[in-house]
């Protein structure tokens, strides 16, 4: 079956290249990014550590299917809590980020620099629409110093909201998210359980642009096996190229790294050899283990097939952050966020982290000349037709722009598998 799929991909490739009669323009030169300051580099490392601990906490939640979080944005949310909190409320936020030994000004300046660097979509040649807004009850007034500092470091907006009219309040939140993401994320949530505290909302749309694009004609409808007995139809895009690749035969998994345009970041995909729950792979996944796997990767010819489309995911991170140690800020009776409002009358009721993540064919022109090379005649097959884990990694700092898993893409049921 896989051999037939590989043959099909090459037939598509041959037809696509035949139609591409013009010699493509040279690919864009690799981008440049300013070197991070020592404090920002330290926080890049800490945010990468946070990525794995948060992912593991979320993966254990049986109610969660697809996972999609931006660790650097979560780190900024913790920085915001630290900025607006006092005493244990503030120190817990720094502790979750493993930044207890850093001075407050180092944390805020470092996180601000890191966020600006990683979300610079022009330098990275990716599409990343990002907005953060702190909603407070209508009875709360945000302190001027907090508003100014949170805008400076975290580009966070502030707004009062009246939940006596919950329908109107939800509409306001969702309209802001849609506007922030140019309509790519039309809805953050359908409901808010706790309406007597502050709501921190992150709304994002991210679309990577490949260092070498997929040909737009190499797209077709295929099956994605959610489980061995449940398959949904999705659009799949295909290409063959030279990529960093490693096949861990002992642990029965593959890993491939696909550079994004300007080569300042890359998409890394980890996938078990066969259809299975991701629990086994997730138990292996740590910051250290990822480094080991990447150290074993070699440049190889790989025929890649990926789902094409948009994944929309909203998480309320409140309970997951609480599990990592952020217990006071979310407790109405214990929270001290008095630097936010000047009064000890506020707690963090929800942390909505909403993202639309699009995989498409767009990218730099590919070099047609490589397809005559001998090494591309027998490529490794990376056919992402079952659940996998993925990361978007900054090549300079090792910080993670995103970490997630795709378990159930959008699509209609196709058939039952034996």
From Swiss-Prot:
It is linked to Osteogenesis imperfecta 10: A form of osteogenesis imperfecta, a disorder of bone formation characterized by low bone mass, bone fragility and susceptibility to fractures after minimal trauma. Disease severity ranges from very mild forms without fractures to intrauterine fractures and perinatal lethality. Extraskeletal manifestations, which affect a variable number of patients, are dentinogenesis imperfecta, hearing loss, and blue sclerae. Its main location: endoplasmic reticulum. Residues 1-18 form the signal peptide. It comes from the Eukaryota. The record marks 377-378 as: Reactive bond homolog. Keywords: Acetylation, Chaperone, Endoplasmic reticulum, Glycoprotein, Osteogenesis imperfecta, Phosphoprotein, Signal, Stress response. The modification Phosphoserine is found at residue 141. It is found in: Endoplasmic reticulum lumen. One of its GO terms (cellular component) is membrane raft. A motif (Prevents secretion from ER) lies at residues 415-418. GO terms for biological process: chondrocyte development involved in endochondral bone morphogenesis; collagen biosynthetic process; collagen fibril organization; protein maturation; response to unfolded protein. Induction: By heat shock. Binds specifically to collagen. Could be involved as a chaperone in the biosynthetic pathway of collagen. This is Serpin H1. It comes from Homo sapiens (Human). Glycans are attached at residues 120, 125. The modification N6-succinyllysine is found at residues 94, 296. Belongs to the serpin family.
């Amino acid at each position: 079956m896989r051999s037939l799929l590989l043959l099909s991909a090459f037939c598509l490739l041959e037809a696509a290249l035949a139609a591409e009669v013009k010699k493509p323009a040279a690919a864009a030169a690799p981008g440049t990014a300013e070197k991070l300051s020592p404090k920002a580099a330290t926080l890049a490392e800490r945010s990468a550590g946070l990525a794995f601990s948060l992912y593991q906490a979320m993966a254990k939640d049986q109610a969660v299917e697809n996972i999609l979080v931006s660790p650097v944005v979560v780190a900024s949310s913790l920085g915001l809590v630290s900025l607006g909190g006092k005493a244990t409320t503030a120190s817990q936020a720094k502790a979750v980020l493993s930044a207890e030994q850093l001075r407050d000004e180092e944390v805020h300046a470092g996180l601000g620099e890191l966020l600006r660097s990683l979300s610079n979509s022009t330098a990275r040649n990716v599409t990343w629409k990002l907005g953060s807004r702190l909603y407070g009850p209508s009875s709360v007034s945000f302190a001027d110093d907090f508003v100014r500092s949170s805008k400076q470091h975290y580009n966070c907006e502030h707004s009062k909201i009246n939940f006596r009219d919950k329908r109107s309040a939800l509409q306001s939140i969702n309209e802001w998210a849609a506007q922030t993401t140019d309509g790519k994320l039309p809805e953050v949530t359908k409901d808010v359980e706790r309406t007597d505290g502050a709501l921190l909302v992150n709304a994002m749309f991210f679309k990577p642009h490949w260092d070498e694009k997929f040909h737009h004609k190499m797209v077709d409808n295929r099956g994605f096996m959610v489980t061995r007995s449940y398959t949904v139809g999705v659009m799949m895009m295909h290409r063959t190229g030279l990529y960093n690749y490693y096949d861990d035969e002992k642990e029965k998994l593959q890993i491939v790294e696909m550079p994004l345009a300007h080569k300042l970041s890359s998409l890394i995909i980890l996938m078990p050899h066969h259809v299975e729950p991701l629990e086994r792979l997730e138990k292996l996944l740590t910051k250290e283990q990822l480094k080991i796997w990447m150290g074993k990767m070699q440049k190889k010819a790989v025929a890649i097939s990926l789902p094409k489309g948009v994944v929309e995911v909203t998480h309320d991170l409140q309970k997951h952050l609480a599990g990592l140690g952020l217990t006071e800020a979310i407790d109405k009776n214990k929270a001290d966020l008095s630097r936010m409002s000047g009064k000890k009358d506020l707690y963090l009721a929800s942390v909505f982290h909403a993202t639309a993540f699009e995989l498409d064919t767009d990218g730099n022109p590919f070099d047609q000349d490589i397809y005559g090379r001998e090494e591309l005649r027998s490529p490794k097959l990376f056919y992402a037709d079952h659940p996998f884990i993925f990361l978007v990694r900054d090549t300079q700092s090792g910080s993670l722009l995103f970490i997630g898993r795709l378990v159930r893409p959008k699509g209609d049921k196709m058939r039952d598998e034996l």
